[in-house]
Amino acid sequence: MENEMHRRITPSYVQFLTSFSNGLDIFHGTLALYGYRYSFKRDETHAQQPFNLAWLQIEKPRNSTDDMFFIGTYNWDYSFLYVTPDQKVHFCHREDATSLFTWDSIEDMLLSEIKRIYTLFDDRGVAIDPKHPTTPII
């Protein structure tokens, strides 16, 4: 995957991909962390793959710099998450890489976001208020 991206994957995200999950989809894309997609076939065997991490390194917002490693998106407005060299995770809008919110680590981001996003859905997984943004900053 690093060869395809022509860059190294940030260490904390390598740890996530190799020890926890090859990408992650929380509440059907409310928050998606990208990973290694080995096939683009759409049959049942290949349908559960993550979004391709390499794509995020190409389709970046303005103001982004080479030291920002993009790892995920929110489907509400296609805003981004990225990791900086200090391994902090940042939230930004899709058009501008200026950090609007920061977590100290991928683990901190996951714990707080899963808890927060969980409160936006009922017991059946349906959005309580479909018009309410699902991003960390409104």
PLM regions: where:
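A surface-exposed partner-binding patch
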Residues: 1-78, 128, 133-138
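Short helix/loop capping segments that flank catalytic or ligand/cofactor-binding pockets
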Residues: 79-81, 91-92, 100-101
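Short acidic-glycine loop/turn motifs at beta-strand connectors
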Residues: 83-86
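Compact, glycine/acidic-enriched structural inserts
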Residues: 99-124
